[in-house]
Structures are given as C-alpha cells and as structure tokens.
Amino acid sequence: MKIKESLAVGSFAFFGGILRYLIGLVLNQPTGFPYGTLCVNLIGAFCLPFLMRYIVARLHLSDQLALAIGTGFFGAFTTFSSFSVDAIRLVNQQQWSAFAWYVGISMVGGVLLSLLADYWAVKLTHNPEEQEVSQ
C-alpha cells in the first residue's frame, strides 16, 4: 500500500468534498432542480482535463501531486452518484422536463466542456508565440 499517495489523495479529497458540500448548500433546493450537483460536475468536467493536459505539463507536477488533485480533489468534488440520485428523484417526482434537461446538460455539457478544456490546454501548451519568447 502506498501510504504517502493515499494520504495525499485523502487530504485533497477532504477539500474537494467540503467545496462540493458548500456549493450544494448554496445552490441545491430540496425539491427543486439540482443546480449544485450540476454545477460541480460541469466545473469538474472542465477543470480535470485541463489540469491533466496543461498544468501537469507546464508546471511539471509530480505524479503524486497530479494524483492527489485529480483523484483526491476532483474525485471528491464531482459526483456521479449524486447525479444519479438527483436524476431518480426528478423521475420519482415526475418532473420529466427537469429530468431531461438535467441529464442532457450533465452528459452533453460535461463531454463538451471536457473537449473544450483539452483543446484549450493543447493550444496553450503549444503556443508558438510563447515558445519564441522563451527561446
């Protein structure tokens, strides 16, 4: 067992989980649309691919720190299980329109934001103007 990596992941997960909880407190309504869960999942869908492509490459983060941020922070910050529970709650309440919007925005929006983040990170990583300045 890799104790050091496990502690790093757990430490970062602590902060990711707390931030998700606080956003949920502010945005989620007990019987309404799950804005908090949608928000954290879309933020995570953008930030994690960007982090993995750009920040790790540019800042030369260690594998251990990348693991702690990716698996720890963003793993705790984003939540597929809460997404699923929220979707089921909308179905049980027969809020069909809200269910369709929630699932659609979560899935399509998440993938599109991930693609955008990756594209943007590649562009920033391979910026020819910046490379000329640094040479």
Swiss-Prot record:
It holds the Pfam family CRCB. Na(+) is not transported, but it plays an essential structural role and its presence is essential for fluoride channel function. Keywords: Cell membrane, Ion channel, Ion transport, Membrane, Metal-binding, Sodium, Transmembrane, Transmembrane helix, Transport. It is found in: Cell membrane. One of its GO terms (cellular component) is plasma membrane. GO terms for molecular function: fluoride channel activity; metal ion binding. InterPro entries: FluC. It is a multi-pass membrane protein. The chain crosses the membrane at residues 7-27, 32-52, 65-85, 96-116. It catalyses: fluoride(in) = fluoride(out). Na(+) binds at residues 75, 78. Its main location: membrane. One of its GO terms (biological process) is cellular detoxification of fluoride. Fluoride-specific ion channel. Important for reducing fluoride concentration in the cell, thus reducing its toxicity. Belongs to the fluoride channel Fluc/FEX (TC 1.A.43) family. This is Fluoride-specific ion channel FluC 1. The gene is fluC1.
